[in-house]
Design a protein with these regions (language model features):
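An N-terminal assembly and electron-transfer interface module characteristic of large anaerobic redox
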Residues: 1-228
Length: 228
């Protein structure tokens, strides 16, 4: 996505003005200044732009706070990992959250956990964390491993996202190395319709239910029968 504005700019003729503002959150007041830059494209009124910014931020903070509810259950939980633009868009993710709920499972999202907690657990990663998204996903990974809050992990990836190719592989490797929690990587672009997506999701759900029903089962394979 980083190169998309330049690709469009130099490959499509007679374009209107592109909104190509760099968002840098390192400095405290940068976001407001950057939103002013965007706002001036539409209206030359600083007061209205600032009011719109604060209103939008208040709505965003409110919606985000609703996600950070305390966990009621520590069973039947599945975490869905991936970029917010995939997890929040029910068209892109093929309504996966509703499908999990219908199957009797609770879904968790990385946004439900406090940033301070994820920062603490992200430090357990031995390598260098390059992006905030990487920090969020690897922090969620280590937090879930220690707290044992979930029975399954689903990572929704977009084929065109280069960051996903690094983050998803790192998360999967750490999960498989440190625990036996089932992990499934679903690349949403691989499925032209819901058929293939649903088949993989249903198989994953069935496997979770089978594990729970048979967690105390010990196979008799290899035992001898003695008769007299």
């Amino acid at each position: 996505f980083c190169g998309l504005p330049e690709m469009i700019k130099y490959s499509v003729k007679d374009l209107p003005k592109l909104i190509n503002t760099k968002i840098d959150l390192v400095k405290k007041d940068n976001l407001l200044n950057q939103m002013l830059e965007v706002g001036y494209i539409f209206i030359n009124d600083k007061k209205r732009i600032v009011e719109a910014y604060h209103k939008a931020k208040a709505i965003y903070d409110y919606e985000k706070s609703k996600l950070k509810l305390p966990l009621v259950n520590k069973t039947n939980n599945v975490v869905i990992m991936g970029h917010p633009y995939v997890l929040s868009d029910d068209y892109l993710n093929m309504n996966i959250k509703a499908k999990l709920k219908k199957a009797g499972l609770n879904y968790l999202l990385p946004e439900m956990f406090d940033d301070d907690i994820l920062t603490k657990y992200a430090k357990q990663y031995n390598g260098k964390v390059f992006w905030y998204f990487f920090h969020q996903m690897i922090g969620t990974c280590f937090y879930l491993l220690e707290q044992k809050l979930v029975e399954g992990i689903i990572y929704l990836s977009s084929f065109g996202c280069g960051i996903d190719s690094v983050v998803a592989e790192t998360v999967e490797r750490n999960i498989r190395r440190n625990c036996d929690i089932p992990f499934m990587l679903l690349t949403i672009d691989e499925h032209s319709g819901e058929g293939g997506f649903n088949t993989r999701l249903e198989a994953f759900i069935d496997m979770l239910k089978w594990r729970k029903q048979n967690e105390n089962y010990i196979s008799p394979y290899g035992n001898y029968l003695y008769t007299r």
